[in-house]
Regions:
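Pre-Walker A (pre-P-loop) alpha-helix and adjacent loop at the N terminus of AAA/AAA+ ATPase modules
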Residues: 2-39, 43-45, 108-113
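Walker A/P-loop
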Residues: 2-3, 32-33, 37-84
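Conserved RecA-like P-loop NTPase ATPase core
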Residues: 17, 27, 42, 51, ...
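Helical "lid/switch" subdomain of P-loop NTPase nucleotide-binding domains
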Residues: 23, 71, 85, 99-102, ...
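Short loop/turn elements that form and flank the Walker-type P-loop nucleotide-binding site
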Residues: 35-37, 68-71, 82-87, 115-118, ...
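Alpha-helical transmission elements in cytosolic ATPase-linked domains
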Residues: 56, 105, 137-140
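Single conserved hydrophobic/aromatic residue that forms the stacking wall/gate
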Residues: 145-156
């Protein structure tokens, strides 16, 4: 089966991420201590590993056998996230899903508890492409997640 080069060679563990030691250390420490925030914003120029770190983080917070804050890469959850069969980790491309209805759909999904994982993780790639109304809806969603009891196992 064909796989794009960036998918084939994308780092799968924090230790494989290059030139991001500070953020990798902070994320590992949060995972190891069990103090995971409800929202993270990764910024930087193209190709610096923002999406890669988000995907590794999604695996690490849900991994059944984490090792020093890294995902094991072998458990059912890690393999399921890698092959896309785990529905609790969702990657949304905001460049093509940039409307307020897309964010409202995301907000509605956060009301449900995770089905297979410890956390539901939403990775919004290219978030700067959201419309103004969609971004406002996202901010409202983040505030609801922060104060709402049923959605405390959600990370955006």
């Amino acid at each position: 089966m064909y796989r794009a080069l960036y998918r084939k060679w994308r780092p799968q563990r924090f230790e494989d991420v290059v030139a991001q030691r500070g953020i990798v250390t902070a994320l590992r420490n949060q995972i190891a201590s069990g103090r995971v925030g409800h929202a993270y914003l990764f910024t930087g120029v193209r190709g610096t590993g923002k999406t890669t770190c988000a995907k590794i983080f999604a695996k690490a917070v849900n991994c059944l056998h984490p090792q020093n804050g890294d995902p094991c890469g072998e458990c059912e959850i890690c393999r399921g996230i890698d092959n896309g069969s785990i529905l609790d980790v969702v990657e949304m491309d905001a460049a093509s899903n940039n409307g307020v209805d897309d964010i409202r759909d995301l907000r509605d999904e956060t009301a449900y508890t995770p089905s297979a994982c410890h956390y539901k993780v939403y990775i919004i790639d290219e978030v700067h492409m959201l419309s103004t109304s969609a971004f406002n809806a996202l901010l409202k969603t983040l505030s609801l997640i922060h104060i709402s009891e049923p959605t405390r196992r959600v990370v955006i």
